[in-house]
């Protein structure tokens, strides 16, 4: 027999493959899935242990008994039908066309019943099919070739044949054995099948006799009685049933539609009215409908009944809204409008909030003169090398850092010490808690030291003096203390209240003592903040990054800032996209006293601006846009308009020469410092006109603006893009790049001085006395004389002096010695000269020669 797969054996046994696999594995066979193969012995062993499950069906004997009863009932009907057929054959006028339309249906039903039985029933099914074929042949013999048996149900016959073909090999064996039955048995089976078919036909379709006229097989007239209904010819009852079903379904559908249409519309449940209508003047019907939970049409109708005709978009005044609220029977309360553009009010409210206060880190600003060691001090505290990256060792912007000491955090702000950065130092003093004043022990008190003291006193901030560079040979800390007493900073050792710490930032000496003093001072101040409210603070610095866009260094003074917060910074707004701490790491939130760098603003804010976090993005956007409009209006107001009052001043300014300048810098603070310093340059007759300032690299737009306005571009810590550089070379635009601010200031000052009209000073070079005159026709009067003093030059100016009075001032037309033209004649030599356009020369006139020399601008 060979090997057999699991799914084949499962099909023969009529059991699921999973069940067969489980039983095979229990018997120890190596079976994995339904495609595994079994030997003959294994298959027989598995068949012996498998319980065959049959589908639910009625037992075969019941089917057989019903078929037998059907045969007994239809014997009489079959005999009558055969007699009728014989009468039609004798007359020859009609051709009897007996169609057993439902024969195959009966066979298919028998076949279906037999399929559910075991081997014996399958044999009967096959015998029944053969007997049906035999009945067709017998019927053909009885009709004598005149009657034609047509099978109208070929499809059913095909299905029954297909079912018979799909039997298993056992069925084929049984049917083969049944083919050896004798003819008598076949004829009996044929009769049974025929009667059964007739019975089924009569039972399903009834006795339906119909006459049909048409052409017969040989062209004659054909009258046939159709007993029983087939698929095509006896289907009147079937059509009637089908029509009835269609009518019923159509009626049911129409009835359902009527029921749906007849349903009453659902009653809309209105939300209850609010107890108080909180409104703002200028609301329309749509806005009021949302507040009152009513449709705008209802609001408009009510107002119309009250004598007010409006549409849903028309703004309503205060009286109309209050009348509407009274008609609804509720109170009306006008909402107080908060000016979202007033950031100072929001900032003060957030700062003055005393709920949920918690200790915060102190903010310390380091101030002092240039090169007194401020950045070096922070360098030692942070263990980094910031100074090496600064241009010329000068801090150009505020640096914000955090240092941990004894488990506590201190925030340091490093401010520039150069004179140009006054505004940046003032900002640092305003946002700080403690000021550390760094004074070099060898230099003592310098101008920016005094300025830092004044800033700290104006901000009412305590000062800790750090006397630096005590390691230098010429250091004199006591002299520094004596100098500072003149400005009210008296050391504690001398009976004052100012803390002095002598340090060496270069070698890290006494730095721990300085940090201890800072923490002690912060404990005295009792610094607290509310971390649970919206964040508020100040802008330390702002810049435009090519990859990040607008960036701003902020100091959070109140609340906690999170990534994604809607924020208004000065005249700009945005949503916090990223936050970076002083170590360059991204963070998700920032608590009070934390310096951070954020991105996500729509523009670059100004250094020193305040920022406030809003509850929603829409309010933040509205506030930012309104503040930007207000700033633009203020800028336009500052544009000077010529009136009769300022006409003379405008005329005087028109006489002044201007140096047009475009300033581009890396950060906003540097832009402010450079612009302020250039405006302070005092050169008589020339002034600086700054036409544009911005942060970021020098681009093509800057070059185009400079070319149109004939301006100079000053780049501070920035460089032009390659496209801008090429365009500047083409358009002959002057771009000056600097890294140290006072170099830029000196260069602009020199350019301004060079624009002045040159100043000339008269210098007398010599004198000559006229002793003889010669009048020559067509030439004029020639004077001959002697050089009595200095040198007479050919290109010098001359004056004719007679009796101490200047008679004429002009130029020499010619200068000769004897007959030769010469360039100059020195003292003690004779000369001959002719004055241009002047012939009234007389003896004893004095000719004074002079030149105009340019005086350099001081």
UniProtKB/Swiss-Prot annotation:
Residues 359-528 form the tr-type G domain. Keywords: Cytoplasm, GTP-binding, Initiation factor, Nucleotide-binding, Protein biosynthesis. Residues 80-226 have a biased composition (Low complexity). InterPro entries: EF-G-like_DII, IF2_II, IF2_N, P-loop_NTPase, Small_GTP-bd, T_Tr_GTP-bd_dom, TF_IF2_bacterial-like, TIF_IF2. Residues 414-417 are annotated as: G3. It is found in: Cytoplasm. GTP binds at residues 368-375, 414-418, 468-471. One of its GO terms (cellular component) is cytosol. Belongs to the TRAFAC class translation factor GTPase superfamily. Classic translation factor GTPase family. IF-2 subfamily. NCBIfam families: IF-2, small_GTP. This is Translation initiation factor IF-2. It comes from Lactiplantibacillus plantarum (strain ATCC BAA-793 / NCIMB 8826 / WCFS1) (Lactobacillus plantarum).
